[in-house]
């Protein structure tokens, strides 16, 4: 899912995305990247996964289809750059899954319930925690990274253009993987958070329930309600 669209670009079912990951991948080798290898590849693979999803390809919801690029995007990039074994990658995916379980058990990962902060936010927290374990971070550091992620994405709305999981979802996956890398870097450097992960998950859920329906996957607000978006989707007239 993270590699196929790079090799063979394909247009999404809704026609809103397609080919972005190929452009990013080629850009990495032009010597002009602002992000460097890890982040550049992370956003490339994250966006590619969303292209696969939007063109009816096979993906793993992690934790949702709309946020499915973030965990593999970061983990695959780290493996490629640092040479982690497949066994090590499998191991840290359990870590990511544990963070996702905590969110599903105590809050939500659905954009229709909690906004994009619940989808991309939790996926980003999962990726950050897994990245910490890859680099031998402690369990507490994993939670610091995940907590930082949720602070940074608190209040993010779910506003898919045309009710499709394409745009701005693909861009949000790039932002989510970037956020995960930032949070993991901070935690690895020894930066702590006095608001624990459990409380951040709770407050994310509280904020999500306070979002109006227009900003929770209904495509009635945010980016989806802009004139340009309505013109693209032909559903608002």
Q: Locations of the language-model features?
A:
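Conserved phosphate/anionic-ligand binding catalytic regions in large, soluble enzymes, centered on
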Residues: 56-74, 116-123
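N-terminal glycine-/lysine-enriched basic segments
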Residues: 78, 104, 108-117, 123-124, ...
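Generic N-terminal targeting/processing segments that precede catalytic cores or assembly contacts
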Residues: 1-57, 80, 190, 197-237
